[in-house]
């Protein structure tokens, strides 16, 4: 007769959870930031709001974003005029779009990740799906399972309405699944579509306007598992530890509310200040056990909520400008894609490292940090270990 301890030991993996593949996808519709203010005020019938348009232009100019991808085209918006108003009942129209498009875009990214992984999809044991775009039952995790033709017995977890920190959350959850289930291969998908938050401008709700200047659509997928099969699976990053915390005195700093008018977005001005003031505490808690206190010795993946957050974090920690290169690159090329952003940055970093002939996936360095920031204010901190190229 076996003991519970023996069963438990046999169930656990030996090594750390490891990212084995990354795939990304965006809608085909690409929007240049320099042209967006004119387009946005025209499509929302707001061209008479000239002062507000000037404000929005300045927001877009300062955003450090070059282009974004969006499912919402001019044609779709013309067919759904309520989406273009500031506060018109439009939840049904938004939901009808995202319940179809979120899993569909997720499938595109997942297909790329599975292809890179190189193993049959029947070996996927778990699915973790995350989106802040819409809610449905059965969820986007179920739809993705069907779209990909995964086994009906695949173990699914659906995370709705988490917000921008959730790229860190999915890594934390996938790490626990991979390390506590021997042989587990977890498909992680973050898929975000701004059709839930798009709305016309309003003079009294400038934080909504900030969202219109920053948010973009995108989907990213990872395969995560422990004990990679030599010669068959290629490790990219190891997940060493993961933590989540709520920042002090940050109630109401970032809120989102699902209403008849869609998902409304509320932002306190001092979000960059709150994050930069508290970030070192998270770093010390994560890296003190490893004997690391030089933040420039790490490679960096930070959720690019907006340029002000990155600037203040950089300044507060005296980071060298190149530390946030991959993060700023993704913000510039895609905008803020909520939970998917940090996964895009992982992909950008490993791609650039291979291209530049660096010795590890982490910009030639051994240890790295991944940060997710979002509603709460909630901060996710993931310690990464790079892999030799």
Swiss-Prot record:
Pfam families: Chal_sti_synt_C (PF02797), Chal_sti_synt_N (PF00195). Pathway: Secondary metabolite biosynthesis; flavonoid biosynthesis. One of its GO terms (molecular function) is naringenin-chalcone synthase activity. It catalyses: (E)-4-coumaroyl-CoA + 3 malonyl-CoA + 3 H(+) = 2',4,4',6'-tetrahydroxychalcone + 3 CO2 + 4 CoA. It is an enzyme of class 2 (transferase). The active site is at residue 164. InterPro entries: Chalcone/stilbene_synt_C, Chalcone/stilbene_synt_N, Chalcone/stilbene_synthase_AS, Polyketide_synthase_type-III, Thiolase-like. The keyword Electron transport does not apply. GO terms for cellular component: cytoplasm. SUPFAM superfamilies: Thiolase-like. CDD domains: CHS_like. It is found in: Cytoplasm. GO terms for biological process: flavonoid biosynthetic process; polyketide biosynthetic process. Its EC number is 2.3.1.74. The keyword Cytoplasm applies. Keywords: Acyltransferase, Cytoplasm, Flavonoid biosynthesis, Transferase. Involved in the biosynthesis of prenylated phenolics natural products which contribute to the bitter taste of beer and display broad biological activities. Chalcone synthase that can use 4-coumaroyl-CoA to produce 4,2',4',6'-tetrahydroxychalcone (also termed naringenin-chalcone or chalcone) which can, under specific conditions, spontaneously isomerize into naringenin. Belongs to the thiolase-like superfamily. Chalcone/stilbene synthases family. This is Chalcone synthase H3. It comes from Humulus lupulus. The gene is chs_H1-211.
């Amino acid at each position: 007769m076996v003991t519970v301890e023996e069963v438990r030991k046999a169930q656990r993996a030996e090594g750390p959870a490891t990212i084995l593949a990354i795939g990304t996808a965006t809608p085909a519709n690409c929007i240049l930031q320099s042209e967006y203010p004119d387009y946005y005020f025209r499509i929302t019938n707001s061209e008479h709001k000239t002062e507000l348009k000037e404000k929005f232009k300045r927001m877009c100019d300062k955003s450090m974003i070059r282009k974004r991808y969006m499912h919402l085209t001019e044609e779709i918006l013309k067919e759904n005029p309520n989406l273009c108003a500031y506060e018109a009942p439009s939840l049904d129209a938004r939901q009808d779009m995202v319940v179809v498009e979120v899993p569909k875009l997720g499938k595109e990214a997942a297909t790329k990740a599975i292809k890179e992984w190189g193993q049959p999809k029947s070996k996927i044991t778990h699915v973790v799906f995350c989106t802040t775009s819409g809610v449905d039952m059965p969820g986007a995790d179920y739809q993705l399972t069907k779209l990909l033709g995964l086994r009906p017995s695949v173990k699914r977890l659906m995370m709705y309405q988490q917000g921008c920190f959730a790229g860190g959350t999915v890594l934390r959850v996938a790490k626990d699944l991979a390390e506590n289930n021997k042989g587990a291969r977890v498909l992680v998908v973050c898929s975000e579509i701004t059709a839930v938050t798009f709305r016309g401008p309003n003079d009294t709700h400038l934080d909504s306007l900030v969202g219109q200047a920053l948010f973009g659509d995108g989907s990213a997928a990872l395969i995560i598992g422990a004990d990679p099969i030599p010669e068959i699976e290629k490790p990219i990053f190891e997940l060493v530890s993961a933590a989540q915390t709520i920042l002090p005195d940050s109630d109401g700093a970032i809120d989102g509310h699902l209403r008849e008018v869609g998902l409304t977005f509320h932002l306190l001005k001092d979000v960059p200040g709150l994050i930069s003031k508290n970030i070192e505490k998270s770093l010390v808690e994560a890296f003190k056990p490893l004997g690391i206190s030089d933040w420039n010795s790490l490679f960096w993946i930070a959720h690019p909520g907006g340029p002000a957050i990155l600037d203040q974090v950089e300044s507060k920690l005296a980071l060298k400008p190149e530390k946030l290169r991959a993060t700023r690159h993704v913000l510039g090329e895609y905008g803020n894609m909520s939970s998917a952003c940090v996964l895009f940055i992982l992909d950008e970093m490993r791609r650039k490292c291979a291209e530049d002939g660096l010795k590890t996936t982490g910009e030639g360095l051994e240890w790295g940090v991944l940060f997710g920031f979002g509603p709460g204010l909630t901060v996710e901190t993931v310690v990464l270990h790079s892999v030799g190229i």
